[in-house]
């Protein structure tokens, strides 16, 4: 076996091991939390779960079963747009959000990248309130910050962060032309009112050219073990086994 072929194989195996070790599955993550079973089911039904799993860096804002009443009776096309607004195209954990330098940030979501958003519909406003809590709301002018950050569901810096918020963030997407489907079963619990923010400035999270631009805050330095993240553990194990088998075979050929 030539040395160039050996180097190529080791490079390929190392890359595969690195990629596999950072993989995640949002369905498996939420399967560990019964209170998010409805949200988890909707992600699968709208095929957003597979989209999330293909991303290398993502933040998912999840809503408990008792706080999904605002999505009751909505067609699948509307639900998909609303849920995609809860998928942020960057990594944000609690520490990063609570330490925003300007106390507020504009977040780019999957809905914005779909090309279906109108105006500021594809962006979220995250703001640190006077009491230190973090609240979310649509970036559409006149929208309130109704969704409060509750806690962390899972985190794998800097690949995926799953955060529990108090209510779904709603925008008006019913006027869009899209196919409809059967409505959902009703759920209960209205959203909470929001507090007034303590800072009027905005710090933007890399929005496209159509939105006002500014730099986002740097990721928080809390890398380490994933809190509650369910990884695709079989892939790294298989890759490691494959690599070790090749090394054993290669060493045997050298004898």
Swiss-Prot record:
Residues 222-231 have a biased composition (Polar residues). Residues 1-23 form the signal peptide. It is found in: Cell membrane. One of its GO terms (cellular component) is plasma membrane. Pfam families: Fasciclin. Keywords: Cell membrane, Glycoprotein, GPI-anchor, Lipoprotein, Membrane, Proteoglycan, Signal. May be a cell surface adhesion protein. This is Fasciclin-like arabinogalactan protein 14. It comes from Arabidopsis thaliana.
């Amino acid at each position: 076996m030539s040395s160039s072929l050996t180097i190529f194989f080791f490079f390929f195996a190392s890359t595969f091991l690195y990629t596999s070790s950072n993989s995640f599955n949002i369905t498996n993550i939420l399967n560990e939390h019964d209170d998010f079973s409805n949200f988890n089911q909707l992600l699968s039904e709208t095929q957003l779960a597979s989209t999330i799993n293909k991303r290398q860096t993502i933040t998912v804002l999840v809503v408990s079963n008792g706080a999904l009443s605002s999505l009751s009776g909505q067609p699948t096309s509307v639900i998909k747009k609303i849920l995609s607004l809860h998928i942020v195209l960057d990594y944000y954990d609690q520490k990063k959000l609570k330490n925003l330098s300007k106390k507020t940030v504009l977040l780019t979501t999957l809905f914005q990248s779909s090309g279906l958003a109108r105006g500021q519909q594809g962006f979220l406003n995250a703001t640190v309130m006077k009491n230190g809590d973090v609240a979310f709301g649509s970036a559409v002018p006149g929208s309130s910050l109704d969704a409060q950050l509750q806690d962390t569901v899972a985190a794998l810096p800097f690949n995926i962060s799953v955060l529990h918020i108090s209510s779904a963030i709603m925008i008006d997407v019913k006027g869009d032309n899209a196919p409809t489907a059967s409505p959902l079963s009703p759920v209960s619990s209205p959203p909470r009112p929001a507090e007034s923010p303590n800072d009027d400035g905005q710090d933007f999270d890399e929005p496209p050219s159509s939105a006002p631009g500014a730099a986002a805050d740097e990721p928080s330095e809390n890398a380490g073990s994933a809190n509650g993240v369910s990884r695709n553990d079989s892939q790294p194990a298989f890759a490691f086994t494959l690599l070790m088998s090749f090394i054993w075979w290669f060493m045997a050929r050298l004898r």
